[in-house]
Amino acid sequence: MGKRAGGAAAAAAAASTSSAAGLEPAAGRGGGPRSAAAGLLGALHLVMTLVVAAARAEKEAFIQSESIIEVLRFDDGGLLQTETTLGLGSYQQKSISLYRGNCRPIRFEPPMLDFHEQPVGMPKMEKVYLHNPSSEETITLVSISATTSHFHASFFQNRKILPGGNTSFDVVFLARVVGNVENTLFINTSNHGVFTYQVFGVGVPNPYRLRPFLGARVPVNSSFSPIINIHNPHSEPLQVVEMYSSGGDLHLELPTGQQGGTRKLWEIPPYETKGVMRASFSSREADNHTAFIRIKTNASDSTEFIILPVEVEVTTAPGIYSSTEMLDFGTLRTQDLPKVLNLHLLNSGTKDVPITSVRPTPQNDAITVHFKPVTLKASESKYTKVASISFDASRAKKPSQFSGKITVKAKEKSYSKLEIPYQAEVLDGYLGFDHAATLFHIQDSPADPVERPIYLTNTFSFAILIHDVLLPEEARIMFQVHNFSQPVLILPNESGYIFTLFFMPSTSSMHIDNNILLVTNASKFHLPVRVYTGFLDYFVLPPKIEERFIDFGVLSATEASSILFAIINSNPIELAIKSWHIIGDGLSIELVATERGNRSTVIASLPELERSSLPDQSPVTLASGHFAVFRVKLTAKKLEGVHDGAIQITTDYEILTIPVKAVIAVGSLTCFPKHMVLPPSFPGKIVHQSLNIMNSFSQKVKIQQIRSLSEDVRFYYKRLRGNREDLEPGKKSKIANIYFDPGLQCGDHCYIGLPFLSKSEPKVQPGVAMQEDLWDADWDAHQSLFKAWMGIKENAGHRLNAMFEVNTDLQKNIVSKVSAELSWPSVLSSPRLLKFPLTNTNCSSEEEISLENPADVPVYVQFIPLALYSNPSVFADKLVSRFNLSKVAKLDLRTLEFQVYRNSAHPLQSPTGFTEGLSRHFILNLILKPGEKKSVKVKFTPLHNRTVSSLIIVRNNLTVMDAVMVQGQGTTENLRVAGKLPGPGSSLRFKITEALLKDCIDRLKLREPNFTLKRTFKVENTGQLEIRVETIEISGYACEGYGFKVVNCQEFALSANASRDIVILFTPDFTASRVIRELKFVTSSGSEFVFVLNASLPYHMLAACAEALPRPNWELALYIIISGVMSALFLLVIGTAYLEAQGIWEPFRRRLSFEASNPPFDVGRPFDLRRIVGISSEGNLNTLGCEHSHGRGFYSNASSRPGTGSHRQCGTSVHPHSSHGSKNSADVDNVRTRNSSSMSSRTSPQAAASQSTSKTSPLVSETAAATQGHTASRKSRGAKQGQHSSQHHSHSHSPLEQHSQPPPPVPQHQEPPPERLSPAPLTHPSHPERASTTRHSSEDSDITSLIEAMDKDFDHHDSSPLDVFTEQPPSPMSKSKGKGKSLQQRKAKPPKKQEEKEKRGKGKPQEDELKDALADDDSSSTTTETSNPDTEPLLREDTEKHKGRPAVPEKQESELSQGKPKSKKLLNAKKEIPTDVKGSSFELPYTPSLENKQRRNLPTKIPLPTTLASGSKSRNPPKTKGTNKLVENRPVALSKFLPSSQELGNTSSSEGEKDSPPPEWDAVPVHKPSSSTDSLYKLSLQTLNADIFLKQRQTSPTPASPSLPTAPCPFTSRGSYSSVVNSSGSDTKAKQTSSSKSKLTKAASLPGKNGNPTFAAVAAGYDKSPGGNGFAKISSNKSDFSSSLGISHIPVDSDGSDSSGLWSPVSNPNSPDFTPLNSFSAFGNSFNLTGAVFSKLSRSCSQSSQRSWNEFNSGPSYLWDSPATDPSPSWPASSSSPTHTATSILGNSSGLWSTTPFSSSIWSSNINSNLPFSTPTNALSSISLMGTENSAAAHTPSASGPADDLGQTYNPWRIWSPTVGRRSSDPWSNSHFPHEN
């Protein structure tokens, strides 16, 4: 109770603050006075308080709680005001017995309250006074309540009534319904019980026809929006001024939904009803909601309030809800038309609910329900129209019919039925009047005005007030209303004068049938007023054009024609047709029909009228709105000319005359065809046919018009272009084409055709469309179209007719009938059942489907197997029944054995992206142009031996779907031979018995034995298919093989169940007693049937029968031929051996005789190397220097390391065109001599050129040279790969440096060439082209070639000495690599080779050799991997001390310093690699015994160069710290040149190894240290004897040195290693000479290009030779020094000149073929000499900087030259490189001869060596030159290790020690260096 009271208070509070929603602006704009706004708000506050309280307490006691703090009373102004009072305690109902009779302790004034009649929605308030008659007791009032919502009481003014005192409270009566209302108010006191007070009231209809909105029931989150209709009961316009709403959920809106409007929206005309506002209630929470709407108008006075309660129940229960709480039909009169209201419902449940019935309860004849079953969708937010309810007031005879309920029942049982109340106010009665008073006739003659009074009779039960009389616009020209100035009241059941109607006839005859509008308080009434003429209307019926006269047109003389015409009575009175007759000859008339209707009715009934007639031709009367039809007939009677006549119809008002015209002519116009039948069509296909006219007149006829007499827009015509409009007489003329286009009427909703969207198109069409890649919805689309077609067909709408009329000047109405027919098209022109023949499972069969586009637009077609649909079973059943396909046992829904292929070879593509062809697997797209015919192939490829049936869906945008049933049977070919199935068990036996072999033991052999067995087998086709056997094979051979032969071995065919005999012969060869072979039948379909042929022979007769077999007749001839050929070959071999032996012996013999006659020097004289050095320096050192470096191509290494422990003396001055292995050594020597002479003659200028070039463009020259080197290397690579194995023994391939006469040190600051990459495992790409692959054929070849070369040496004193290489201990890499397979094969060969070379060396004067070696000292001191930088300064100092050589130029020093850091990096890289490396393909497959010995003598620490050799194998060297950045590591590029281990094995550490003759490491055996002095003595003898020989041999020109990196201190660019170490001044002249000769012609032996192996001095080059460095020539000429200088990009091959001597197998880094490795590995270690080493050198710019070599050598000092204390000579172990010194390799042209010969000879350990003089290192080079095979000797570490470690007594004569077969086993031969001289 308290809650409801609180709700009322809240409502009151809300009402007090509410605004005129939507009306406030209107009120402002409307100008309505808002008087006493505060007072109105106060009154509204009070009323709303009471109303809300009443609404909350329908059947409960109204509780006045403490929250109610307002008391209501009347003010003087008549408005309701509020005052604040004290709050009350809670209500306590006490069961105190009431006082009875006069004993009541309280008295009410008045005793009871009667409100009498009050309109609904308009409250009235009265005050009640309470008196306390007691003089002692004080009455305490607690509360007051009521049990109805119609009465509302305020609280007491005073809570306590003192004795004799009084108080008061207010009671408000707000009627909600019409009728009596009474209630009892309960007044509760604290001590005196409960007092009652009676209140009464009567509710009457609201004068504004307003009603409360009660009983609305809506679901949550929906709305209730009734329209507030206000009736204006006043005679003045009613203006709504304000309108308020009390609740927050209730707001007011304009009915139109606009935001605002003018005052006209809220102005209601007098006596009219208008909707002024929409009350919109939004239901947010489930509860009972109550609100109020306060309306104020301009007619409201101070006592009049309009308050409309709004009660809405919001619920969450699912169910059916109505949009309105009541169907209010309003006020209706009995003569009004039925009023219709629509019923809208909403389903708030979760399931769809079908509505089953809507009917009135109780049954009411006045209510008509128009309802069709409908389903309400679940959870929709919009109301759905369910039914239309109409109320017919004329049928409401009693008041019970004015109201009731509409009951809605749903199929959902859980939903209760919905009842919607309805009501209507029916006004029973009418206003009567005299009809004649409003009927006026217009005559032909002018008439006077007429005035007629109008009287009305009121039959209503209430008075009718005529407020206004309005004339329509049409009637104002003839009528006026007089005597109506003010409203007229007509009492019930009385008549009264209303106004006078003044009529002024008009001269123009016209009919007026309209209404005068009477505005009354009972709505509006229509008073009919009519003006008539009495005339009849007529018109001629179609197909005549002219309607006002009857025109027969041109008639033939024998023709009779009839025309229909109709007359219509449009007058408000009936007219009698008295008579009708004709005027004229040949005319007749008859009445056809009379009916009610208008013009349209007549035309619609034209076909029936043409056939009908009336037998009764008597006069007729036409009522108003009726018509009569007459037929006029004209008979020509063979008359010619114009015929006129008339028809007259007589009535009381007129005589109607209708003219008749006709032209009668001889002839006629006839349409051909009379009945035009168009072919079947459909939307999208337009059909047409030509219209022809036959002119039988004798004159031309002009066409005037062609038209269609039907209204069907699908029929139309087109005149032909160029057609004349004249019809020639006596001819048939084509005048037009008649078209039928079915698509013109249906538009986008035709029964055929859908838009087609390709998969690339977005679906933008709102309607149904086909999509290329979505087909599961096809059936629905097809079904909808087909249903539309069936509907048309059932209604016979598929047959259409039209009439076309042609009018001419002579004849009219030439009619042709056109018939058209609609059809259901199909794109299939072939049968829908496609049967395939029996098909082999291995094969396919094809059938065609024919397509035709019947439409005039492109049709998109897709063939889709049924299996691709998501639910094929559903589609299958529907399609089979739809297309009447033959029923099959079972459709395979998932088979893909049928596939459609396109026959067209040129696919089309539509603009939308739809392309012909297989869009995806098994789907074929086609585009059919209009009228195009295509065919597609369906291929049936059975998978199993069974019958398969399926459907192929033909998607198209014409009919959506079509289907073709495909049916095929798969089967297999079955073949039997001799009744046996194919397979292993089907043996066809051939058993040869002894009886058949009796000829084997028949010794007489009177005839040839015949062992052939013949068998006949039956071949049967047991399958269903015809088998065509194409071939018969016997174990892969056609028809015959392995003794078996098929006689009738031709192609044959076997039909089903047919058979054939084949004959197979078997002839044994008696090699086995059982022969089992395969007999294979291959069919045209690819099937193979394999049977086993099994032949058996007696085992014991095989031998005898084999002998009995006849031999072939050609056997003897073949035997004789082979024997003769073999004998000839043997003789040829013997002769060749003899010639070769002679070639080997003669040169050796001549050499021995020469040596015997020319002793080299006095043997008794001591071997003084210092003296020899002095002689060579002063005497011919210059010549030797220039000539040797150029002729032999020895490059004194820019870092000519005098102290390198094992100089890789690339000293074998191999002729660039070293002879092939097939030639003997004499040839080799000849070649060498010629080459050396030619090259020596060319190298000097080239060297000069190269020097100059190196200053300017070192890189260019390097590139050129490298290119030459690579080109040559490629030539012989293939040949060498098989012969060379990886020989990586020499860790430092330092060629013996050739010491030239030191020129003044001219430091040259040249642009530093790019540093080379330090050698990685693939350091130098082996250039097999440069290494001799052919080995010498005998061990004497060395001796003979040496003798010849020594003979020729006397003729060429300028040839450079040979570089001799001390065999160094192999690097760990070389050690491990030497363990290959070929290593074992060649282990025994080196000693013989060494002995042979020692013998060879003895024949040469030692002193000459020393001179030659001195000349080559610069190059002989090639930087070997084991060179120790720490000993180099000592050696250099020793050289200076003993020989007085100038110090190395600063530039050379800096070059050396630049070279060192890179070498250091290489060393570091080597350190990282374990020394124990497995054999690699880079090494030779064998290890010489010398090398093995030296390996055993190696210290535990392998020289860092050795480590580098192995290390370089595993990784790319680090970048150097030189001036230039390192080129990227080149192992990959190298690997291009090292495809196999043999390639790298061909390369030595020196640049020229590959191009050089066989490496000298074979020829330079290093023995265990015996006596150092003895060893050196023997060496001196050798070098002296070989001096001249070596001069002759040096042919490689000295290349120009590329410029070295610029160092802080100037030093010789590209200075040789020896120049840096020895601090010698650079030889400017030699530099220039070298530079000038930098470019050699091809005739010159170009190292690395023309076959002349370049100097392989740089230890960084990975020497593959045994004892080689293991690095393949990365540090060749250039890299030997330049790399040591840190020149990362300088090609080690040369200084850039084209001189062959400049190039090593390692091509220029700039060359396209090869990219050198990064850092220079002077000693086989990848270290950078440019960094810390040369930084010191550059700071000091003196020799002292070289003392820092140890600092950068992370390895032991024995990696470098032997210390002074090392008595053992360090033998350079350069591989098969030419004797290009390291200097020349590095391209230090200025320093080629700038330094003195090594201070300490390459074989002398130190100044303090036991030798009294320094031995020139070039002696070794000279010796090395003699080795024409492998010149890569093992590097002997000559560092601080013990002397016996690597130092060995060098016996120069052992170079020529005989090595049996050594040449032939050498991987490097001179064969690849052809002679060019």
UniProtKB/Swiss-Prot annotation:
Q: Does the keyword Amino-acid biosynthesis apply?
A: no
Q: Where is this region: PapD-L domain?
A: 107-281
Chain spans, region Disordered:
1197-1573, 1590-1655, 1679-1707, 1830-1852
Where does the record place Basic residues bias? 1376-1391
A molecular function (GO) held by this record is:
collagen binding
Q: Could you name the Gene Ontology cellular component terms for this entry?
A: membrane
Where does it reside? Answer: Membrane
Q: Where is the composition biased (Low complexity)?
A: 1233-1258, 1420-1432, 1609-1646
This protein's name: Transmembrane protein 131
Fill in the domain comment: Possesses a PapD-like (PapD-L) domain similar to PapD domains involved in assembly and secretion of bacterial pilus components. The PapD-L domain can bind collagens and is probably involved in collagen assembly and secretion.
From which residue to which does the signal peptide run? 1-20
Set out the biological process GO terms recorded for this chain's protein: collagen biosynthetic process
Organism the protein comes from = Mus musculus (Mouse)
Task: Outline what the protein does.
Answer: Collagen binding transmembrane protein involved in collagen secretion by recruiting the ER-to-Golgi transport complex TRAPPIII. May play a role in the immune response to viral infection.
**Where do the TM regions start and end?**
1116-1136
Q: Which domain of life is it from?
A: Eukaryota
Side of membrane Lumenal, spans: 21-1115
Phosphoserine occurs at S1318, S1338, S1371, S1857, S1865
Q: Which UniProt keywords apply?
A: Membrane, Phosphoprotein, Signal, Transmembrane, Transmembrane helix
So which stretches are on the Cytoplasmic side? Answer: 1137-1877
Quaternary structure (record): Interacts (via PapD-L domain) with COL1A2 (via C-terminus); the interaction is direct, may occur with other collagen proteins, and is involved in assembly and TRAPPIII ER-to-Golgi transport complex-dependent secretion of collagen. Interacts (via C-terminus) with TRAPPC8 (via C-terminus); the interaction is direct.
Bias category Pro residues: which stretches? 1301-1311, 1599-1608
Q: What is the lineage of its organism?
A: Eukaryota, Metazoa, Chordata, Craniata, Vertebrata
Bias regions of kind Polar residues — which residues? 1197-1227, 1507-1523, 1538-1550, 1830-1839
> Phosphoprotein: present as a keyword of the record?
yes
